[in-house]
Amino acid sequence: MNGISHRSVCLILSVFFALLGPSGVPVARAQSTADEIQRRLNKLEAEIVKGEDVSAILRLQRAYGYYVDKGMWEDLADLFAEDAVGNYPNGVYIGKDSIRKHFFMNVGGGKVGDIGLGDNRLYNHMNLQPVIHIGPDGRTAKGRWRAMAMLGRYGERSFASWADGVYEITYIKDRGVWKIQKLDYHSGFGASYATGWIVPEKRTASRASRTLAHPADKQRQMACEGFPEACIAPFHYDNPGTKTGGPIWTSSDAPSSKDEPVSGGTIDIQQRVNNLARRAMMLHDEQEIENLQRIYGYYFDRRMWDQVADLFAEGGTIEIGLRGVYAGRDRIRKSLDLLGPEGLRNGQLDDHIQLQQIVSVAPDGQTARARAREFSMAGAYEGRGTWSEGIYENTYVKENGVWEIKSLHFFPTFITDYDKGWGKDARPAPTASSEFPPDGKPTETYEIYPNFHIPAFHYRNPVTGNYPQYPKGEGRPMDEAIQAAMASVKSGGGKAMVSETKENTEAILAEAERQIQRVKDYYEIQNLENAYGYYLDKNLWNDIADLFAEDASMELAQRGVYIGRERVRGFLTNVFGKEGPVEGRLSNHVHMQPVIHVSPDGQTAKIRSRMMQQLNLGGRASMGASIYENEAVKEDGVWKYKTVHTYNTWTAGYEGGWAKNPGKYLPGQSEKYPPDAPPTLIFEMYPTVYKIPFHYRNPASGK
């Protein structure tokens, strides 16, 4: 009977029949036949494998961005299949070896084997906004990602620039490991930091025409090289609000080969149920930790220090830059006052965007580690603005079923004055306070940009399973830091993830089925959110409207509320202009940091997310930021928006930025196409600070 012994079937049936309710109706119908039990287990495992596939692809592509950041070209090349194709602006590279040479020689500017960037160079490469779909065969997948890059050189021959683009990537599962099969990069824009994203007076030479140390294997045929041209990078997916584009994977009852029969050709059902429950829980835990880290960022934005401190375990620690280590929740709370008093005040901006998490949960599900990125915009009105970016290497612990931060360690990459930019200004990392000294000295000493430093990776290469290949000289982490980071994610010493009592087999199985469905829901809602941003980029109003349920609503800024999908469609087309991208206009809407909570019944969800805008609407470069508090509903198995509510936080002209040139005007209700209801909240943007509602309580304290 497909690897399950007759004795096991009899045992499980007897357990299930023993679980009759008061009315005599079975708690589950799986006890009717051994085939039904087998079907449920096979379907559960097939769903878990697909969830693990999505998790692995997210990990793979996020690692890609971290490796590019630090010039870890060997680890980067290892993410590609042997026969992979890299379709970059300067040409097409065929085969892993050619792609590897491209990274070392063309991107790194050195010879093969030269790992690392060296001092005075910035090459930040943020991989954001994933839309992932697993192919029906389970062996291929496709993903859309946004790349946002900050490039520069400090000192002699200094420069600073921005770059943005879209990856459309095909992945392949090779002997159980996901790799990049084909990567197509579509340029969005490239811009000097000094001017921002303005229409250039004359186009620079195409990157394809430049002399390369490692020539491309084939010339790229590009339909568009990005702004100021009007083009759309092809979408690999149908609209996620439709039946064909909504599912992130196709469900099936096909058994997996992951659980091989034990000796004697049989698998104990209880063992299999427990193994599957453990795997489903680990996927759920990954998402819980992603939510936790993103919530930390939202609290930090508003200097909600009491809430930030409550996210830490009682014996937790915090280490920001070279300030030293503060231990214990009370000491953590007091240390945060060094960054300013509780609560953001008018005239202050302190955005801390949490990005690109790679989470590793311990086998027992009681501890975890994660690498994450923070991109920050801070400053004071009519004062000074700053950009900064850095890396977290954190640990987490599950206490009483709730994830908390055990240790938070933030490594700044760079801190720079807004007016000067990273080509001309580089600030040192903050050091220990004499006013409120830390409990311990910094666990690692290093210098930030313009010096080169790599925070040690806690995870191995997602493809090879090998330790990272660090440079031997400049930028290499301390040996002690490498050893500490690469230590296995150890058991927290708590209770086992699932009970092994046979009497609760049905409860464990039902909970695992529920959890993997919530995992799938989370991923599909993430696709919905990120697709919304891509459609906004290109003024695809009809695609945006098709993401909404029939009775949904939209409220943007102070424009009022539009109720019903067709009213949303009419609002977009009548107020914002014609459908599609426009020559000479840039309208980037970078969607980030979703905190997703699915209801217990799996039919509704609430989402907090963030958007950064990069705009050129008439020759003037500008930017802005918003917070969304959205709701989603599942209709016929497809997630759609129930409400989209945008809270604008700030806008600014690129020249001067948020500190010296904030845009205070908020558009009101349209006379041409009036809303169905007035705005639900009247507010003013930065430099005014107003309260944006949270749909959730603190996940650790419940406050």
Ranges and model annotations:
Residues 10-23:
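Bacterial N-terminal signal peptides
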Residues 140-142, 164-203, 367-369, 389-426, ...:
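Short beta-strand edge/turn micro-motifs at domain boundaries
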